Amino acid sequence: MMEGHILFFFLVVMVQFVTGVLANGLIVVVHAIDLIMWKKMAPLDLLLFCLATSRIILQLCILFAQLCLFSLVRHTLFEDNITFVFIINELSLWFATWLGVFYCAKIATIPHPLFLWLKMRISRLVPWLILGSVLYVIITTFIHSRETSAILKPIFISLFPKNATQVGTGHATLLSVLVLGLTLPLFIFTVAVLLLIYSLWNYSRQMRTMVGTREYSGHAHISAMLSILSFLILYLSHYMVAVLISTQVLYLGSRTFVFCLLVIGMYPSIHSIVLILGNPKLKRNAKMFIVHCKCCHCTRAWVTSRSPRLSDLPVPPTHPSANKTSCSEACIMPS
């Protein structure tokens, strides 16, 4: 029997899962339709498509892991595929990193030769960055596939108090390498986001000086900086939780562990919602989807209200000649 706070957090986790799948599913469907219609995909759309696809798979894996931890599914099923979950998680982080780099290169204005070179070529580099990330994660994971599984399984099993165990000292170095593999995209993403925030703040300050404080409000730049800052906070939170779980100091049922579950599910869902709100095309399609759902609900409610009740249906005649009545005549509704 689940405790009260665990049951509450489990319901919140399910809400996060549904929200994240809907948000990422919208991104995938919109860009897939564009690909079918136009036979091509812009670099930004390709990044968003890959990121949303990886996050849908990641959220399915997270939900399956949570079901295992809540003893709703056998945890041995998750242990056998934990290497695949690690690959999807790292791929999702790399795609989010390149998305931050793309925004930084396209929006920021930094007078440096290297940055100007990146600004001119980032669109052509996007497919190669995606392909390189996939190859890098797959190759590095499968080179150490046996050791990776030997480390990740005890970390997952240690969440159960009865099966608590520790990673052996022989695997401590490889565990550091795995954590370092998550640190590299974090470092690149942090640098890109900080450069972008600095560029937006510098541009806002220059505009305020040229136009004047009263005439320049800067709401667009402030909202952009807050949006980018939220990306960084969510990314850092996801990384810190991954490192905290790898230290094996948590166990199932603790409030800290349940909070970590919320943080893990929060990143791929809330980040995708912020991406939709900041992208005009995705935001427009999201509004159309909501309006369509409301129209379908209103139409269904109207049809239900107009449907005749059982008491309003015509009572079949009891005369023997009623058997000769056709089926079409018997089903006629009163006007």
UniProtKB/Swiss-Prot annotation:
Glycosylated position list: N81, N163
Coarse class of the protein's main subcellular location: membrane
Name of the protein in question: Taste receptor type 2 member 119
Positions on the Extracellular side per record topology: 1-7, 65-81, 146-176, 246-256
Family matches, as Pfam families: TAS2R
Residues exposed to the Cytoplasmic side: 29-43, 103-124, 198-224, 278-335
Entry GO CC: membrane
Species of the source: Rattus norvegicus
